Amino acid sequence: VTVYCLTRSSVESRKEELQEIIQSVFAMAGAEVEFSGSYPGWKPNLKSHILDVMKTTYQTNYGVEPRVIIIHAGLECGIIGRNYPGMDMISFGPTIKYPHSPDERVNIPTVAKFYEFLLATLKAL
């Protein structure tokens, strides 16, 4: 039996702790564990210039303040940030339900909204 587990976290040390726990549990069952393909952690900069631009653009275009949240998962920003330290970046996107499961769904109207928002942001830059 082979079990694949992609550990992800916004905090690198927490991801490593989780890997140690997984390793310990499988070791107690007499199994071996090998980790690969891991995403590096990424901590968003809440004082980011691009975040300020996008918040203003969203407010201007939609008449409400955007909902800015930090999620616990590792993101592609971790990979980019590892290769380009100090880059001002942000992660945003449409509404997705049940990610990484057979029931994963995207709310189609939010895809169009975020595409329009991306274009408006690029114009604002």
What are these regions (language model features)?
Residues 122-125:
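Aromatic-rich carbohydrate-recognition surfaces in CAZymes
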Residues 16-26:
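Short amphipathic alpha-helices in soluble, non-transmembrane regions
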Residues 29, 61-62:
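Helix C-cap/helix->beta junction micro-motif
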Residues 1-3, 14, 18:
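Oxyanion-binding "anion nests"
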Residues 3-11, 31-51, 72, 78:
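A short beta-alpha structural unit
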Residues 26, 58-59:
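A generic structural signal for well-ordered alpha-helical segments
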Residues 65-120:
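Zn-dependent metallopeptidase/amidohydrolase metal-coordination segment
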